[in-house]
Regions:
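A structural signal for multi-pass alpha-helical bundles of membrane permease subunits
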Residues: 3-296
C-alpha cells in the first residue's frame, strides 16, 4: 500500500469506526438476538436457539396489522408526496415575483415540531363533545354527516395519517426538486424552443431526465422514511396504537421492548430484522430500476 492510499484510509478511519460501532455492531447484535429464544437482557441468558421468534412475530396479529399499516403508508405517501413536490416545484420555478415568499411558506412545515403539527391535525379532524372539528364543519356545509377521523373507522384514520405524513415530508422534497430544476442549463430549453418542441415534450425529454437523480434520491429516502414511521402515528392517535389499529412496524418493535407488552427483546429483534430485510429488498429493487431510468 503506497503512502497516498494509506493517507486515504487514515482519513476514512473515523467514519469507518463510527459506522462499525454504531451501525454494523448493533445490527449484528440484533441479528443474533433474533435467534435466541427467551433472551433476558438483565441476566444475558436465553433458553434456546432457533426460528421461534420469527414464527411468533409473523403470526402475531399486532405485527400483521402494523405491517399492513406500514405498507399502505409507504404505497400512498411516497408517490403522492413526490408527485406533489414536483408539481409545486415546477410552479415555483416558473414564477419570478414572490418566489422566495412561496418557498418560505412551503418550507415552514419542515421546521415545525412534529408533535405540534399533530396537535393541529387533531384540532382539524377530531370530533369531541364540544366540536366536530374544522374539517367536519366544512363537510357539513356540503350536506355530509361528517366522520370521526381520529377515533372512527379504520380508513378514515389511515387517510389522516397519510395526509399528515405527506404534509410533513413535502417541504423537504420541494426544496430538493426546486434546487434540481434551477440547476438545469437554460441552453437545453432554448435549443428545444428554437426547434418548436412542445412544452410537454420538453418536460419529458429534458426536465425529467435531468432531475431524475434527485427524484430517485427522494423516492429511496421516502421509502426508508415511511418504513420508519412511528412518531407521526403517536402524534395523532396517542401511544396505544394497537388499540387504535394504527401501529407501525417501528411502533411494534418499540412496544415489544418498552411498551405495555414490553420485555421481549428477542421478538423485537426478529421484527427489526424483518423490517431491515424489507427495506433492503426494496432499496435493491429501486437501484436496479434506476439503472434504466435514472440519467447521471
Amino acid at each position: 500500500m503506497d503512502k497516498r492510499n494509506a493517507k486515504g484510509w487514515l482519513y476514512l478511519l473515523p467514519a469507518i469506526a463510527f459506522l462499525g460501532v454504531f451501525m454494523v455492531y448493533p445490527l449484528v447484535d440484533v441479528f443474533v438476538y433474533s435467534f435466541e429464544e427467551g433472551y433476558n437482557s438483565a441476566s444475558q441468558t436465553f433458553s434456546g436457539v432457533g426460528l421461534f421468534n420469527y414464527r411468533y412475530v409473523l403470526r402475531d396479529p399486532y405485527f400483521l396489522q402494523a405491517l399492513k399499516n406500514t405498507f399502505i403508508l409507504v404505497i400512498i405517501t411516497v408517490p403522492v408526496s413526490t408527485g406533489l413536490a414536483l408539481l409545486i416545484s415546477l410552479g415555483l420555478s416558473s414564477i419570478e415575483k414572490l418566489r422566495s415568499l412561496f418557498q418560505t411558506v412551503y418550507f415552514l412545515p419542515y421546521v415545525t415540531n412534529t408533535l405540534a403539527v399533530g396537535l393541529v391535525f387533531m384540532i382539524l379532524f377530531k370530533k369531541t363533545a364540544y366540536t366536530d372539528g374544522l374539517v367536519n364543519v366544512m363537510l357539513h356545509w356540503f350536506g355530509s354527516p361528517g366522520v370521526d377521523f381520529i377515533d372512527g373507522p379504520y380508513w378514515a384514520k389511515m387517510f389522516v395519517l397519510c395526509f399528515y405524513t405527506v404534509w410533513i415530508v413535502l417541504p423537504f422534497k420541494i426544496l430538493i426538486l426546486t434546487s434540481a430544476l434551477a440547476s438545469v442549463k437554460q441552453d437545453y430549453y432554448n435549443a428545444a424552443r428554437v426547434d418548436g418542441t412542445p412544452r410537454w415534450r420538453i418536460f419529458t425529454r429534458i426536465t425529467l431526465p435531468m432531475i431524475s437523480p434527485m427524484i430517485f434520491y427522494l423516492v429511496i429516502t421516502g421509502f426508508i422514511g415511511a418504513f420508519k414511521a412511528y412518531s407521526d402515528a403517536v402524534a395523532l392517535f396517542g401511544t396505544d396504537l394497537n388499540a387504535a389499529q394504527m401501529n407501525t412496524m417501528v411502533g411494534y418493535i418499540y412496544d415489544m421492548l418498552y411498551g405495555d407488552s414490553g420485555g421481549y427483546p428477542s421478538f423485537a429483534s426478529a421484527a427489526a430484522i424483518i423490517l431491515f430485510a424489507i427495506v433492503l429488498t426494496i432499496t435493491c429493487i429501486n437501484l436496479l430500476v434506476s439503472r434504466k431510468h435514472v440519467h447521471y
